[in-house]
């Protein structure tokens, strides 16, 4: 399955919530009615079955982090093999992706833009260029914008946007040097309460 490159608003409308796929402090434009399903007439959402609810939650999280289905299932399997709550492990694995850490540090205004920065070799980890968006960042790793990309306007603008919306506590960033330290893997309480990871576990456990 190819990566989705269509309207971001459509995905948020499909899930009925703001997925923060667009740049800016407020991810959606005012004209994007997330209360209505995609389409000209915005069909009303009927009552969902348990399976439908579980599927929508999985799709929502997958789209938030920009992960394809096969990758997402792989993360679930890795999470299930670790000690602790599978759902929490899953979210932590997604949070440790390099493209997500770049986004959390504010070098990219969206996860999609952050993934592009990584793919285009604009990011280094511990002084070495890494161009794999799914690379798992570990506590203590130093993530930085490479010297050749320091002057990119989009990075400067992304840092300004991040300063407005607030930066997460598990990264320590020097905005002037465009470098940061991934201090620790976030606890479940640090992450969005709008995600019900237990529904995803129930879906994959069938």
From Swiss-Prot:
<dbReference type="GO" id="GO:0042274">
    <property type="term" value="P:ribosomal small subunit biogenesis"/>
</dbReference>
<comment type="similarity">
    <text>Belongs to the universal ribosomal protein uS4 family.</text>
</comment>
<dbReference type="GO" id="GO:0006412">
    <property type="term" value="P:translation"/>
</dbReference>
<feature type="domain" description="S4 RNA-binding">
    <location>
        <begin position="96"/>
        <end position="156"/>
    </location>
</feature>
<keyword id="KW-0694">RNA-binding</keyword>
<dbReference type="GO" id="GO:0003735">
    <property type="term" value="F:structural constituent of ribosome"/>
</dbReference>
<keyword id="KW-0689">Ribosomal protein</keyword>
<protein>
    <recommendedName>
        <fullName>Small ribosomal subunit protein uS4</fullName>
    </recommendedName>
</protein>
<dbReference type="InterPro" id="IPR005709">
    <property type="entry name" value="Ribosomal_uS4_bac-type"/>
</dbReference>
<comment type="function">
    <text>One of the primary rRNA binding proteins, it binds directly to 16S rRNA where it nucleates assembly of the body of the 30S subunit.</text>
</comment>
<dbReference type="InterPro" id="IPR002942">
    <property type="entry name" value="S4_RNA-bd"/>
</dbReference>
<keyword id="KW-0687">Ribonucleoprotein</keyword>
<dbReference type="GO" id="GO:0019843">
    <property type="term" value="F:rRNA binding"/>
</dbReference>
<dbReference type="InterPro" id="IPR036986">
    <property type="entry name" value="S4_RNA-bd_sf"/>
</dbReference>
<dbReference type="Pfam" id="PF00163">
    <property type="entry name" value="Ribosomal_S4"/>
</dbReference>
<dbReference type="InterPro" id="IPR018079">
    <property type="entry name" value="Ribosomal_uS4_CS"/>
</dbReference>
<dbReference type="GO" id="GO:0015935">
    <property type="term" value="C:small ribosomal subunit"/>
</dbReference>
<dbReference type="Pfam" id="PF01479">
    <property type="entry name" value="S4"/>
</dbReference>
<comment type="subunit">
    <text>Part of the 30S ribosomal subunit. Contacts protein S5. The interaction surface between S4 and S5 is involved in control of translational fidelity.</text>
</comment>
<comment type="function">
    <text>With S5 and S12 plays an important role in translational accuracy.</text>
</comment>
<dbReference type="InterPro" id="IPR001912">
    <property type="entry name" value="Ribosomal_uS4_N"/>
</dbReference>
<keyword id="KW-0699">rRNA-binding</keyword>
<dbReference type="InterPro" id="IPR022801">
    <property type="entry name" value="Ribosomal_uS4"/>
</dbReference>
